[in-house]
């Protein structure tokens, strides 16, 4: 009885076939990058003020002073949600009284924007906010729109694995790409905010399902050494490339419906990939479809110019026949030790996710050009992923994760000390904070997989990554705090990031340790506060095995 990797070892690790699969599966992630963050431009809120109807009998002086001023970032700007009572100032205008000279504006009664709003078109021509007036009393709908997209992501993460196990990796990959692209196209024809949001939930379900299945397909087709780079650099970097394309599209297409139409084009361009990306041979074997699996391996061998054995898979022989004890979610809380570690992991994943998505969603709200800021927010992710990969190869996990979290949280806290006029420095600090948090986020899959025993490893990664989806759902409300105080989101995110950095130091170290197979082995892992070494841990230090991939 042989292992699958042993059977196909003759193919090699990095031939033309593997390079093609690596590139095509990574490229299929690009639409996820801009769909996942498209809401920052689709639901952008431009400057706005109460509309004063042309029919109002006002002098030019009163029309120019019909909206009260408020202080924002040290300067006076027109109020966004109120105006002076129109009937009152119309009477003053008819009497020939001048605002500020004959009438004290501070004593005038105010009213809400009964005639709607005037929206600035300096940044956006139209967004869903301007389409359905999602401001003032309805401004709560903007973060809810984003949160519901991530609710769809959460739902999709639950079903994507089960669907791909049932119907095959390739079928589900392209079906979910079609869902993501098709429902994005349908959003163009939304006639209400409710319709747009419901469709957005479905787009979120397709977005994460496509991402997860592409990840699974790559790890199953590619060899062990290539899986490391694919799971850390390939998928993440191409996601960042898609994220960088978003502000480029949005800069030239400033109408939200046309932007959505443009964002569906790359999804359509992925259709030809169907004829180049094969089904997972591992999945075919699990379905006892040996002939189809052999055909794929033979084509791969031909592409790599390698001779094929007469028999690759023996239909009588079972691959990977080991039977594992079934695990339940309660196993993650079976003992005090594993329960504490699980709770700590849930907090670490959730709050790191809050920091990552809140900073990403807040990028257009920074001073300066919204499109450039969003592009920089995406660009900084590429060196963050590369740095994380390099650090994971040699350095202790808990220390490097804690270090980048301290870095990210510390610079976010420092922003409040920067004068308002030094906005370039503030933007630079935000990007450095994004760098640290993104690096930490990309390390969590590896760290979590190394901590838990084989029995519950996949479940642990699944449950903790679900906590990150919860973090993404609440992240828009951290951005929303900026409506009350410009610095509040950074103070809250910075404080929480530093706290979870401290929490990370209390995890056991996994670098150089043999992966635990049972819960009993996990219980003997050395904790930060303990200076004692168990005999097992000392043995593993003499014969270390390093895992630098999530699977």
Curated annotation (Swiss-Prot):
Q: Could you cite one Gene Ontology molecular function of this protein?
A: carnitine transmembrane transporter activity
Q: Which residues bind ATP?
A: 218-225
Q: Which InterPro entries match?
A: MFS_dom, MFS_sugar_transport-like, MFS_trans_sf, Orgcat_transp/SVOP, S22A4/5, Sugar_transporter_CS
Q: What's the superkingdom here?
A: Eukaryota
Task: Report membrane topology.
Answer: Multi-pass membrane protein
SUPFAM superfamilies in the record, alphabetically? Answer: MFS general substrate transporter
Query: What GO biological process terms does the UniProt entry carry, in alphabetical order?
Result: amino acid import across plasma membrane; carnitine metabolic process; carnitine transport; quaternary ammonium group transport; sodium ion transport; triglyceride metabolic process; xenobiotic transport
Glycosylated residues: list them.
Answer: 57, 64, 91
Q: What induces it?
A: Overexpressed upon TNF treatment.
Query: Topological domains (Extracellular): residue ranges?
Result: 42-141, 193-197, 254-257, 359-371, 421-426, 482-486
Output the Gene Ontology cellular-component terms: apical plasma membrane; basal plasma membrane; mitochondrial membrane; mitochondrion; plasma membrane
Q: What is its main location?
A: membrane
Q: Which PROSITE patterns match?
A: MFS (PS50850), SUGAR_TRANSPORT_1 (PS00216)
Q: According to the UniProt entry, how is activity regulated?
A: Allosterically activated by intracellular ATP.
Q: Does the keyword Disulfide bond apply?
A: no
- State its role: Transporter that mediates the transport of endogenous and microbial zwitterions and organic cations. Functions as a Na(+)-dependent and pH-dependent high affinity microbial symporter of potent food-derived antioxidant ergothioeine. Transports one sodium ion with one ergothioeine molecule. Involved in the absorption of ergothioneine from the luminal/apical side of the small intestine and renal tubular cells, and into non-parenchymal liver cells, thereby contributing to maintain steady-state ergothioneine level in the body.
- Describe the family membership recorded for this protein in Swiss-Prot or TrEMBL: Belongs to the major facilitator (TC 2.A.1) superfamily. Organic cation transporter (TC 2.A.1.19) family.
Q: How does it assemble?
A: Interacts with PDZK1.
Report what the protein is called. Answer: Solute carrier family 22 member 4
Which species is listed as the source? Homo sapiens (Human)
Taxonomy, top ranks, is: Eukaryota, Metazoa, Chordata, Craniata, Vertebrata
Q: Which gene encodes it?
A: SLC22A4
């Amino acid at each position: 009885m042989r292992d699958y990797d042993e059977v196909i070892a003759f193919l090699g690790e990095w031939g033309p076939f593997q390079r093609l699969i690596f590139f095509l599966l990574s490229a299929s992630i690009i639409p996820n990058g801009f769909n996942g963050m498209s809401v920052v431009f689709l639901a952008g809120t431009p400057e706005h003020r109460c509309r004063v109807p042309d029919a109002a009998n006002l002098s030019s002086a009163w029309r120019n002073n019909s909206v009260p001023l408020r202080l924002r970032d040290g300067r006076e700007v027109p109020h966004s949600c109120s105006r002076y009572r129109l009937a009152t100032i119309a009477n003053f205008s008819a009497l020939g009284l001048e605002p500020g000279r004959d009438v004290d504006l501070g004593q005038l009664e105010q009213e809400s924007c009964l005639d709607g709003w005037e929206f600035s078109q300096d940044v956006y021509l139209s967004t869903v906010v301007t389409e359905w007036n999602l401001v003032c009393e309805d401004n709560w709908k903007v973060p809810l729109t984003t949160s519901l997209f991530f609710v769809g992501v959460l739902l999709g993460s639950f079903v994507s694995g089960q669907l791909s196990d049932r119907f095959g990796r390739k079928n589900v990959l392209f079906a979910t790409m079609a869902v993501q692209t098709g429902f994005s196209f349908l959003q163009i024809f939304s006639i209400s905010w409710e319709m747009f949001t419901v469709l957005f939930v479905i787009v979120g379900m397709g977005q994460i399902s496509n991402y997860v299945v592409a990840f699974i397909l790559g790890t199953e087709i590619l060899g062990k050494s290539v899986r490391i780079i694919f799971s850390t650099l390939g998928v993440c970097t191409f996601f960042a490339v898609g994220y960088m394309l978003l502000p480029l599209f949005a800069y030239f297409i400033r109408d939200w419906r046309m932007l959505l139409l443009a964002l569906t084009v790359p999804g359509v361009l992925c259709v030809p990939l169907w004829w180049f990306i094969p089904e997972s041979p591992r999945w075919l074997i699990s379905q006892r479809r040996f002939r189809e699996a052999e055909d794929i391996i033979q084509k791969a061998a031909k592409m790599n110019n390698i001779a094929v054995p007469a028999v690759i898979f023996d239909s009588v022989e079972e691959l990977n026949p080991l039977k594992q004890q079934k695990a339940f979610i309660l196993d993650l809380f079976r003992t005090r030790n594993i329960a504490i570690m699980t709770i700590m992991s849930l907090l670490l994943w959730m709050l790191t996710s809050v920091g990552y998505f809140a900073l990403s969603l807040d990028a257009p709200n920074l001073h300066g050009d919204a499109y450039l800021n969003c592009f920089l927010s995406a660009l900084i992710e590429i060196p963050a992923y590369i740095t994380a990969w390099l650090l994971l190869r040699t350095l202790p996990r808990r220390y490097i994760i804690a270090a980048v979290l301290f870095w990210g949280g510390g610079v976010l806290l420092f922003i409040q000390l920067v004068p308002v006029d030094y906005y370039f420095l503030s933007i630079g600090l935000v990007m450095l904070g994004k760098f640290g948090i993104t690096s930490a986020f990309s390390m969590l899959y590896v760290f979590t997989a190394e901590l838990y025993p084989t029995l519950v490893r996949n479940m642990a990664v699944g449950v903790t990554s679900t906590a990150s989806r919860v973090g993404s759902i609440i992240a828009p409300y951290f951005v929303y705090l900026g409506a009350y105080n410009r610095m509040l989101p950074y103070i809250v995110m910075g404080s929480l990031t530093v706290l979870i950095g401290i929490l990370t130091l209390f995890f056991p170290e996994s670098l150089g340790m043999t992966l635990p197979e049972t819960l009993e082995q996990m219980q003997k892992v050395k904790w930060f506060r303990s200076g004692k070494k168990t005999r097992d841990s000392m043995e593993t230090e003499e014969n270390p095995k390093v895992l630098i991939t999530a699977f």
